[in-house]
Amino acid sequence: MDLPIYFISDVHLMQTESSEEEAKRESLYRFLNFVRTTRGTLFFVGDLFDFYFEYPDVIPKSYFGFYNKAFQLKKAGVDLRFIAGNHDYWVLDFMKEKIMNHTYFDDTSFSLRGKNFYITHGDGVLSWDYGYRLLKKIIRSPFFIWCFRLLHPTLAYKIARKVSRTENHPELPQEV
């Protein structure tokens, strides 16, 4: 793992076009350009996307700008590491192989210069959050994923926009 190491979490890139979303993406891209100049390692610690569900032959075109920037970083030698969050758990080979260097579906840890690091997105860690932990088991189950993948991508993403908490609360901070 190369130094410096950067961490970014909960960006929640949206599929919708708005001035707020454009400003958020511009801010993210400035950060990614900075990381590119320093090389190193960049961890995306969950919820990079407000919703991401990859199909074997279909990727969401609304994230093209991010894919392009991330691919440029990877080609420039930046080690890109993606930890799946509760909004973007369902990645396949495009994100795992073409965009990122490493993908983690659970928490990860590493040691560096005698220090131990434990990296987690943090969803479902509250001891009393039984309902969410049950939901997490269901939506990450192979059966659920298989069933959801039967939906046409346009319909799947439309459903996701309806149930997204971030999409329904535009007053939440969107700064990167």
State what each model feature region is:
Residues G122-V176:
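Active-site-proximal loop/helix segment associated with metal-binding centers of metalloenzymes
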Residues F7, N116-T120, S127:
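Short hydrophobic-aromatic micro-motifs
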Residues L73, M100-N116, P142-T154, E175-V176:
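Short flexible/disordered coil segments
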Residues D2-P4, I8, L13-L112:
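Core catalytic region of metal-dependent phosphoesterases/phosphodiesterases
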